[in-house]
Amino acid sequence: VAAAIGLKSQDLLLLDTFGAVTQPQDWEQGRRPIVWASNNFLMEQTGFSLATLRRHVRRLCEAGLIWMKDSPNGKRYGSRDEDGVIVEAYGFDLAPLAARNAEFEALYAHLQQERQFCKSMRNKITVTRRIIRAKIEKALESRLKGPWRDLQGEFALLLQRLPKRSTA
């Protein structure tokens, strides 16, 4: 899903870090998950430099996944009540991410369908390739009239042009 919406692995690392400092109740309906972690904490957790951290925050904002909720003094801070519910907070607002949950689930389902379709097509291509090779070989063994040697060579060239799939 991340690649489909233009995110890179480092964007995901930062989102994951944001998520790790939230609490389950932050994600309940009607609540706003806000992260007020310092730049130093975020840099320590991600291994980013300050410039890299700022770049990925900007990318997440541009992707519509987070908003900045600025305090009057420009600092990030927050407080929770005795139940752990955010009472007041300024920082990275993850509400856009939460609001797009259904969209991401639908996109994930669509991508899974596409992967399954591609897997099915690869399997069909493999079976068809084996059938063609077997028929050409059988024709050669049976000494049937026709350009079977030429077809065998053309088929080998065609197979060489097919993209190789990595097994990793």
Name these PLM-found stretches.
Residues 30-47, 60:
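A short alpha-helical element within helix-turn-helix/winged-helix DNA-binding domains
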Residues 71-79:
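Short, Lys/Arg-rich nucleic-acid/phosphate-binding segment
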Residues 62-71:
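A short, conserved structural fragment
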